[in-house]
Amino acid sequence: MLCCCCSAYKLDELKTYSPAQFAAAIDAVWDNVLALERPEPVKLSTQPAAPAKKNSLLDRILPGIRSEPSHLKVAFVNERTPETSTWTSQHEFGRTQLDQVFAGKVETVAYHGAEPGKNADELVEKAIQDGADMVFTTSPKLVGASLRAALRHPDVRILNCSVDMPYASIRTYYSRVYEAKFITGAIAAAVAREDRVGYVADTPTFGVPANINAFALGARMVNPRVKVSLQWSCLPGDPIQAFQNQGITVISGRDTPTPFRPAREFGTFRISPGGTLMDLASPFWHWGQFYENVVRTVLDGGWTRDKSGTDGTAVNYWWGMNSGVMDVLLSRELPHDVRHLANILRSGIIAGSIDPFACYITAQNGTVMNEGRTGFTPEQILHMDWLCDAVEGHLPEFDELMDCARPMYRMQGIHRDRLPAEKEADL
């Protein structure tokens, strides 16, 4: 219980509390304590909620009984600015979509430059003091500030862009990137002239092994001989240069550009003998579609239908391509036949007739993980901590990571539960 309190409150702050204040703090985090005690503390919501039924008998007998708000003020708190982060700019596009779709009903405002441990708590608090009814914090690093704000303001809906965070006071959201990776893996193998392709992964957090495996399975579907060479951006060295030294020319890089890498070294691309990069395909987030769906749920009174309510589990939205939130951008330079293949796979995933993991799968150590008669559950996919035998590489442990990657691993790493607690447990 104390660990949960320390996640929500700063330890120095708790030391100053009177017994009554400490009891109130425990009461505020109690739902989160209950969630942590459950075998499955996080409930994955894999589909948008069904629209609320109107004109029901209850509506006719007691008009106005529903709790739909007539107006919402929605705040977005970003770790960085749109000018310095493509990730933030993508969420900004999503915010402006809300303004367009719900003109007159929804007002949005953005706060940039929220730094955890510095001004993040203050910016989230400012958003609420400025009248926000709903707050989206768009980085996993802001989950601590989100949780603390939710405990101070239980009537404000607060959502953090992350996965598998066991806090019932907030909701979290992300997308099933592995579906897009399955398609880009097939594209990579189709255009590669050799039987090896490269894959750059960020940090071994929840969902990342599934992305790697889905990419490898998509590639192997096109070329059964293909091997996926895995490099990590969270480890020392230059992954792209390492691939070039191995003669690998088709690479799955970072999912979004960064100021520190050339803009074309993202998504899946091919390097020509002369060093020219050709874009092939890239996962793409339609954040506006996600925000529109969630806000519409609030406006039609259906927010509580997504919440587990009485069982006290945390809610994590984890939507895929069939929701419109996730997609794949195909390059104009992609060969026609390969584009046709990608569109077939996309249509199959959206329709549910193609499941990247509904096939025979062997792990690197030879263990048969799936005999192919069925797929995996969403929880099994999100919590994968193994690599299939088409992958050359490993999942690094915490001690191998560069210092800049360790905070993210502590929050969302696949083996975060094995790590000793930090002295100051402030998120």
Write out the residue ranges for each language-model feature:
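A residue-level marker of the well-folded mature domains of exported/periplasmic proteins
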Residues: 12-427
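Short helix/strand-capping connector loops at secondary-structure junctions
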Residues: 2-12
